[in-house]
Amino acid sequence: MNTCGKLIAVEGIDGSGKQTQVRLLSQALESRSLQVLSTGFPQYNSWFGKMVGQFLNGDFGPHHDPHFTALLYAGDRFECKGPIVAALEQGQIVITDRYVASNLAHQTARSSPEKREEFRAWIEHLEYGIYGLPEENLVLYLRVPPIQAQSLVAKKSVRAYTDSAHDILESDLRHLQAAADIYDRLARRPNWKTIECYDPRSDSMRAPGDIAREVLAAVQPLVPVLQEKR
């Protein structure tokens, strides 16, 4: 798929501050007169997204094949493919809070360990091959230890898809650890940049502004105008 824009995905386990960094990065780019489309997944108001919300709320029960849920998440992105591709073709910078890697990390973590590599390839073929979703130019991985991330999730405001402080994945620390391990492996890819968001010396999250400066520095090679002196 030929595009002239750039696609930047902000990834990380729940509670890593993705939404905040998408907002700050969008503001930083727009302040430099760049056209930006910011979005995020799941889109809980889409046809597939509503089913994702039901899954996360536990409406489908505790046990289901991860192929089923991977299809839901991929379908949610497919429903939003049009605006993303259009923005890229117009030369815009698309920044998304979660993208394909979230499916790879969270759903692969729910599969049996001996089949995880095969399942990862299956998801990538589904999203990039079957659905034709554009591939990321850059993935920003906001890395946070699962135990700290889980406590941060509990501080979130009430979300539309669940009345609980944690959805069924957020409440499972073993799942979060497995997903974090998969993210760590994915982060070895050349188009990924890992940003450590937790400071073990202070036993707390780094300030959002400090993280945002590191995020912007990681984006600079992708967007030449950011390298110009102001």
Specify the residue positions occupied by each region the protein language model found:
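Hydrophobic positions on the alpha1 helix immediately C-terminal to the Walker A/P-loop
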Residues: Q21
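Pre-Walker A (Motif I) flank of P-loop NTPase domains
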Residues: T3-L7
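Conserved lysine of the Walker
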Residues: K18
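Hydrophobic anchor at the beta1->P-loop junction of P-loop NTPases
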Residues: V10
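P-loop (Walker A) phosphate-binding loop of NTP-binding proteins
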Residues: I13
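A glycine- and Lys/Arg-enriched "phosphate-lid" helix/loop adjacent to the NTP-binding pocket
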Residues: A101-D181
